[in-house]
Design a protein with these regions (language model features):
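Short regulatory "switch" loops immediately downstream of catalytic or recognition motifs
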Residues: 33-37, 71
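Interfacial aromatic "cap" segments that immediately flank transmembrane helices
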Residues: 2-33, 81-111, 123-175, 218
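Cytosolic juxtamembrane C-terminal amphipathic helix followed by a basic/polar low-complexity tail immediately after
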Residues: 203-218
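Hydrophobic alpha-helical segments
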Residues: 24, 32, 75-77, 170, ...
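Selective recognition of hydrophobic, aromatic-rich stretches within alpha-helical transmembrane segments
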Residues: 44-78, 105-141, 171-206
């Protein structure tokens, strides 16, 4: 595995010439999330409806993460087009992404409630590799992808957390731009995580064939 600064450098290289595209997708996801939250703002009783609808944003977010992953693999396709096409043709059409997102959200909420929020953070990092695994291994079910993510992140959650912490300066600076800076910081972080996934996959699964992975995840 590499240092956080090496991951950040590779993320910047992958996003070279694509920052604008990445920011546009971030904006699309942000606007979608805001629109979904409107019912709870208008009427207090609609809070539960907002929670349900927020699950529908997850496949779009997953499609975004995958577009950045493919960018690190050399894809030249425009990020906005890739994200929207993947969301429509894969993430929403294939219920695996929606089911996985729902399960992870429920586990995060339960863990957060009983551990004052700490458990929710742990669950987040435990299952953070799920969208990448569902993409790379179409034969995996949501449960199998979650199991494999747990195994991959065993002993690696702190390392990824530290990588995320190195972006704190950029996050704080984005406050000075009324949060607009996050449209660029978010893809920067997500691309670094995608590269982290690639390294972790190679390190943990290098001796595994796709057939073996499918079998052991059952």
């Amino acid at each position: 595995m590499q240092t956080p600064y090496e991951y950040r450098a590779q993320a910047r290289e992958a996003l070279q010439g694509r920052w604008g595209e990445a920011a546009i997708v971030s904006l699309i996801i942000l606007v979608t999330a805001v629109l979904i939250s409107v019912p709870s703002i208008v009427a207090e009783w609609a809070g539960s409806l907002t929670t349900v609808l927020s699950v529908l944003v997850l496949p779009l977010q997953y499609a975004y993460y995958i577009s950045l992953l493919e960018r690190t693999r050399g894809s030249e396709e425009e990020l906005t087009r890739f994200t929207l096409q993947y969301a429509i043709n894969q993430a929403y059409a294939n219920t695996r992404f929606l089911v996985a997102g729902l399960l992870i959200m429920l586990l995060s909420i339960v863990a957060a409630v009983f551990t004052f929020g700490i458990g929710g953070i742990i669950v987040k990092y435990m299952y953070i590799m799920v969208p990448y695994l569902l993409h790379d291994y179409p034969e995996l079910t949501p449960r199998e992808a979650m199991k494999l993510s747990r195994e991959m992140m065993s002993g690696q959650k702190w390392e990824l957390f530290v990588l995320d912490l190195t972006f704190i300066g950029w996050v704080l600076l984005s406050i000075l731009t009324a949060g607009l800076g996050m449209l660029f910081v978010e893809p920067y972080m997500s691309t670094a995580r995608a590269i982290f996934y690639k390294d972790l996959k190679e390190e943990k699964l290098i001796e595994e064939t796709d057939e073996t992975i499918s079998t052991t995840a059952e």
